[in-house]
Design a protein with these regions (language model features):
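Phosphate-binding loop that captures ATP/GTP phosphates
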Residues: 87-88, 93-138, 143, 150
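Pre-Walker A adenine-sensing motif
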Residues: 44-52
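Glycine-rich phosphate-binding loops of nucleotide-dependent enzymes
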Residues: 129, 172, 185, 291-294
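C-terminal lobe/tail of nucleotide-utilizing enzymes
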Residues: 2-43, 210-296
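Phosphate-binding/switch loop-helix module in NTP-utilizing enzymes
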Residues: 135-183
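Walker A/P-loop phosphate-binding motif and the immediately C-terminal alpha-helix
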Residues: 52, 57-94, 210
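Residue-level signature of catalytic and energy-coupling elements of molecular machines
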Residues: 55, 66, 92, 100, ...
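Inter-motif core of Ras-like GTPase G domains
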Residues: 161, 180-201
Length: 296
């Protein structure tokens, strides 16, 4: 008997702790022999939106490791959908390494009232909330422990006046630690986009991320492989600088039907560095964007 749909994976607050918790629970309820049964449903942990927010679809962007361009992909997805007329927001959950504001050229701190926090908007109307927009000096480090970071991520959901938003992208830090777990437990995530790169080692790391979404019972909408190839400007031939990957094999093995491959294009990171990600006009994420639009 499966316990997946009756467990919210909140072992710390479980009223019926089992031996798995003492040994380090891996949240693999389907293969657990204990079936705690005292944790309640997954929905019990979801945090409510406030009265000033009507977010229709929450999409988490994750990667198994850093340095694959996850925040750049998040920014590009938000920008493209905004240009198509959708109301879009980005919750920057990478609290200690935020880069979303820089991609959009947003430097002004967020405003707040006694009731809520107001997101900043990009030139094209993408709403953004980030830890960097709380600091007096955006180069100051945030040196916090996990529970405090997780608490701020939840506040970005419960205390921000998001307004009417069709798609809220949650840009998560790399890995499968505290913040992804908090996001998957606290927010009504409709699906996940996994960002990766072509190196062999990455396929193993991608599988870790995909397996986490399976354990949390959240579908993977698609995989984005960044830096997949380089197009010669003289002959238009594709060159696989890092070798051809097996991302399609990984996708098939987990029944993921959507893969977008982004070329190495120096123009995109240069625009992000200038805060002009919305000026990038190449259509490199069409497959994933079309999959996301089906949620609307």
């Amino acid at each position: 008997m499966s316990n997946t749909h009756n467990c919210n994976h909140d072992c710390e607050n479980c009223e019926n702790k089992c031996e798995e918790v003492e040994q380090g629970c891996n949240h693999d309820c389907d293969n657990c022999s204990h079936h705690c049964g005292g944790c309640g449903s997954k929905e019990d942990l979801l945090k409510p939106q406030n009265q000033y927010s009507e977010v229709k679809n929450v999409i988490a962007i994750m990667s198994g490791k850093g340095g694959v361009g996850k925040s750049m992909v998040t920014s590009l997805l938000a920008s493209k959908l905004s240009k198509e007329g959708y109301q879009v927001g980005i919750l920057d959950a990478d609290i200690t390494g935020p880069s979303i504001p820089k991609c959009f050229g947003i430097h002004e701190r967020v405003a707040a009232s006694s009731e809520c926090i107001f997101p900043r908007e990009s030139r094209d109307g993408v709403k953004v909330v980030s830890s960097n927009l709380l600091l007096e000096n955006e180069t100051d480090p945030i040196i916090w422990r996990g529970p405090v970071i997780a608490g701020l991520v939840q506040q970005f959901w419960t205390d921000v006046a998001w307004g009417d938003v069709d798609f809220l992208f949650v840009d998560m830090p790399p890995g499968t630690g505290d913040v992804p777990l908090t996001v998957f437990q606290s927010l009504p995530v409709k699906g996940v986009i996994v960002v990766t790169s072509p190196q062999d080692l990455v396929s193993m790391i991608v599988e870790k991320a995909v397996k986490m979404t399976e354990k949390m019972d959240i579908p993977v909408l698609g995989i984005v492989e960044n830096m997949s190839y380089f197009v010669c400007p003289n002959c238009d031939e594709k060159h696989y600088i890092f070798g051809e990957s097996n991302v399609e094999e990984v996708a098939v093995s987990y029944s993921i039907d959507t893969v977008s491959k982004m070329p190495i294009d120096g123009k995109l990171p240069a625009l992000c560095d200038q805060g002009l990600v919305e000026a990038y006009d190449e259509d490199v994420l069409k497959a994933v964007i079309n999959k996301i639009k089906k949620l609307a």
